[in-house]
Structures are given as C-alpha cells and as structure tokens.
Amino acid sequence: MTTTQKLQKRLNDSKAMRWTALIIVSFTMMMAYFFTDVMGPLEAPLTTKGKIVYFDNGTYMSADALMNVCPSIASEGDIAVGNTYCTEIIGEDGNTATESLTVSSTINGLGWSNGDYGIFSGAYGYINVFLLMLFFGGLILDKMGVRFTGVMSTALMFVGAAIKWYAVDNGFSGEMFGLPTQVVIACLGFAIYGMGCEIAGITVTKVIAKWFTGHEMALAMGLQVALARVGTACALFFALPIAQSAGTVSAPVMFGASALCIGLISYIVYCVMDKKLDNSIANQETAGESEEQFKFSDLKVIFCNKGFWLITFLCLIFYAAVFPFLKFATNLMIIKYGVTPDLAGMIPGLLPFGTMLLTPLFGSLYDKMGKGATLMIIGSVLLTIVHVLFAMPLLNVWWFAVIVMILLGITFSLVPSAMWPSVPKIIPMKQLGSAYAIIFYIQNIGLSMVPVLIGNVIAANTNDGTTDYTMPMSIFALFGAIAVVISVLLKIVDKKQGYGLEKSNIE
C-alpha cells in the first residue's frame, strides 16, 4: 500500500470529520470565554456598597445616594421595582427641575474597592504565573495527549467556577491577607478556573493543529477564536441583564458555571473522535504518535528559537493591551462617553462580534496568500491608534466610541489570525504543546499584572466618582507601540531564518 493510500485513511482527511471536531472543541472554549468575562459588566454593582438601583431611563445610583435625594425613603428595603421617585436636579442654566425616576431593577452590591476589583481581575493568571502550572500543563499535554489534558483542564474550569460562584453568592465577614474574605475566595476560584482555562486553550490549539495541518489551519484557528469571542460578547451583553433580573451578582456567575459543565461534556464527546483519529493512523509515523514521545531535552528546540520568543513577547504585549482593557471598558463608556449603564456593555460587545467575522476572513487569507508577519505588523499599528484615540480628550460621544471599538475589532482579528497559525511553522509538532504553554504562561504574566496596574491607575485618577481615563489609555497605547516594534523584528527574523510566515499554509 502506498503512502498516499495510507494518508487517505486518516480521519482528518475527511472534511466533515475535522470540521465537526473543530465545532465541538470550539464550543467548549466559547463557554470558557463567557465565564472569563462574565464579571466585566458588573463592575458597578461589585464596587457599590449596599443596593444599587437602576432606573427606566438607563441611569443608576446607589441606594444611599437615592435616599439622600429622596428623604421619604426610610431604608433600602423600601426601594422596590416599579416605584417612582421624584428628585430635584439643577440644569445648566442654574434652574431647578423635578425629574421622575422609575425603578426598573436592583442589584445587591458587594462593596469591593476598585483595587479589590483589579486584584480579582488579575487572579485569573495567579496560579499559572506564580506556580508555573501552565508550563507544567504544556508538559502534561505533550506527554499525556489531548484527551487526558483536555478533560483535566475543563474539569478544573468547572471547579474554579463553582468556588467563584460560592464566594459572590455568600456574604463573608473579616479579612484575609489584608483583603476582604469574599475577594480572597473569589480570587481563589478565578485562579483555579484560569489555570484550567489556559491549559484548555493550549490543548484546543494543539487539537486544531493535529486535525488541520496541511489543510485550512489558519481558517480553523480563526473560527475557533471567533466562536470564543461569541462567548465574550454574550458575557458583555447579557451578564448585567441576568444580574438585574435576579437582583444579585451571583446569578450570571452561576449561569456561566452551568455553561462550563456543558462544555466539559462536549469535550468528553470530542475525546471519542480523537481516539478514532489515533486509531486511523495507528500504523503510520504520525503527529498523533509523536505527542506521546516528548522528552525534556526537546525544550532546547523551543528556548533557542528567536522567532518563537518574538511571537511570545508579541502575544504578551498585544493581549495585555486588549483583555485588561475590556475589563474596564464598560465604565469607560459610561464615564467618558456618557453611555447609559444598560447600553454601556454593548459597545465593548461589538469587539467580539467583529472578530467573529473578520478573524476567519483574515485566517483564510493567510491560508491562501500568506503574509502572516505583515498582518501582525498592520494589526499592531492599528492597536496603537485605537488606544491613542481612546486616550485623547476629544469627541466624548457614543458614536465615536463605537467607531474606535470597531477599529479595535479589526485589530483583534488581524494579529491572532496570523500569530497562532505561525507557531507550528516555527516549532515542530512534538514540542507544540510545550511551546503554546510557554506562550500562554508569559501571556498570563501580562493578564495578571496589567489589570492590577490599571486598577490602581484608575483609582489614582478618580475624584468624586469621576475618572480621568487619559493615563490608563496611554499605558495601553504604549503597549501597542511596543507590539509594532516586535512584529517588525519578527518579519526581519523570518526573512533570515526562513520560517515561512509570509508563505501560504495550503500548498
């Protein structure tokens, strides 16, 4: 039997089978991305002590503030959905007018500080960064394969999500390590979840490389990213309405934990397909077998590769300028651009919807035309422009924020669509799990530290409840400029080393 005849028997040569595998694992990651960002639109109730009251005109205020302007309210318990209150407001002309406000919903706030919220947001990567668990996860992936590692990581996600839900659903008194006990427990859950999510991320990426090498790999990775962004968009759009409907911050967290349980079941279904794929290539020298033959000495191939380190640092800087920004973007829309709280999460929500369409498009272009390094340069330049526009004190209106967010969506599609499919061109399949683990590990340093930095900068630039976002956005713009330099260097190194980043993926 010829080699060609053998190759035709591989399960991943069936277009239907490889795309089915992609859909299943992408669904699991979509559930994960929903949970990752489910707390983003809830910053206001998280950082408000006592009840927070939302009105039918899209505004909100704390119960204490409402009682100050409406002395007839004796206590928080008197505030109920449907009640109408009259408040006096002073117009720009100095005249006093009466405004009627009808309560549309209330949420019990947790009373965290901005610093607490920043620490919590950064907790996602604490275990991965400080205990090196993501790095070890990559070693486990290369030694044990995608089935064992995938089930392990998705189970960790669910356990961490359950702990996080328990923390925000229950009141805790006292402090631990100088922080409120509730914040510490929520951080623990989010850190365990983050460990599982990042290991799941590298596992799914290797799954795609396993099924799509020699096929539409950039398109497949682009579609996986697109579906993940659907999860992010759903979190930004629906987290606050779910919390308002239930009256508690814990409701969307519980919803997200339930979604993760479904994602775990989906991955177990994928494992059946993966076993069949391995069986279909059992008698050949394949990538499936090389996964089980990893040796620690193979790490030298990774550590001595210049192109690998440039992509790693590009990933660190690029994602540090996007994901932490999204965590604070809802309040940016409210405070700087005057968007009502009930709509503020929808503008950042445009970002995932844009990437849903554009990431697969740019991935398909990379598959057919190449120019991966060039795409990364263009995306990094656009990233810098976006954050400069957000930092500048001009056009503080909602439509300008929408335009800039759409531009960020293009940026967020260009770089990942070229960056992730480029790694298998630089690193052999046998070390691919460890390579992705190192990239994700270093990326997590940024995802852990940057939210804390930005949270503290925002706190330092907040007076009387109003925040000046010039400095935080300038920091993000600096990250973009660094990304431009790194991506240019990557193109230069690619030309010297011949990685083929500018060549098409389909031959």
Annotate each predicted stretch with a short phrase:
Residues 155-178, 381-395:
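C-terminal ends and interior cores of transmembrane alpha-helices
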Residues 122-139, 349-362:
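Central cavity-lining transmembrane alpha-helices of secondary-active solute carriers
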Residues 183, 189-227:
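Cytoplasmic helix-loop-helix junction between adjacent transmembrane helices
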Residues 142-154, 367-381:
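Cytoplasmic membrane-interface "Motif A"-like loop-to-helix N-cap segments
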Residues 39-44, 305-359, 416, 450-451:
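Extracytoplasmic gate region of multi-pass secondary transporters
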Residues 372-419:
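C-terminal transmembrane helical hairpin of 12-TM major facilitator-type secondary transporters
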Residues 2-14, 278-311, 507:
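Juxtamembrane intracellular "pre-TM" segments in multi-pass secondary transporters
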Residues 251-270, 471-489:
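Symmetry-related core transmembrane helices of the 12-TM Major Facilitator Superfamily/SLC fold
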